Amino acid sequence: MIASVRGPVLSVGLDHAVIEVGGVGMAVHATPATLAGLRRGEEARLWTSLIVREDSLTLYGFADAEARDLFGLLQTASGVGPRLALATLAVLAPDQLCHALSDGNITTLTQVPGVGKKSAERLILELRDKVGTVAGTAGAGAQAPDRGRVRSEVSEALVGLGFSAKQAEQSVEAVLAADGPVSDTSAVLRKALAALGPKK
């Protein structure tokens, strides 16, 4: 198992980044929030999970071990493969996912594309006991994110995805104004992307 990769970022795409490890460029699939934290030319470390199929080897990367472990946990549920597991973590932060599973929150889980009411009920039934105490400790001691830092990181990520600086700034400001207390970077990025829609 490849537990993590570290090296300079060669490129960042819409759904993956290429990180050079020992002279080899490794394509690592990740969520938009994780990709937003990567900068071309800078060194990065991602916690990874290697999915082996008969015709492919696919590497998935995460900002921390908790997200990587949840990615693996999700795939122990019936009908959940790596794509749906990654989509779930793209929509729900690790602490949100843990709370939704432990509390039986179907509404939160059905925010994920591809997860309907029956699928959400199955996830809760199969994973609630496996989440354990993570839900109660995932966000313990976390500091409130700085509004200026969040604004800057999300704007840079949107520009990197092909939106203009003006579009990025306007969408981020709109999301922050609507949210009131500042959200974390991944939440603001998701809402900004939803507001902007697909890039023309």
From Swiss-Prot:
GO terms for molecular function: ATP binding; four-way junction DNA binding; four-way junction helicase activity. GO terms for biological process: DNA recombination; DNA repair. It is found in: Cytoplasm. Keywords: Cytoplasm, DNA damage, DNA recombination, DNA repair, DNA-binding. Residues 64-141 are annotated as: Domain II. Residues 141-145 are annotated as: Flexible linker. HAMAP family: DNA_HJ_migration_RuvA. Belongs to the RuvA family. Has three domains with a flexible linker between the domains II and III and assumes an 'L' shape. Domain III is highly mobile and contacts RuvB. This is Holliday junction branch migration complex subunit RuvA. It comes from Saccharopolyspora erythraea (strain ATCC 11635 / DSM 40517 / JCM 4748 / NBRC 13426 / NCIMB 8594 / NRRL 2338).
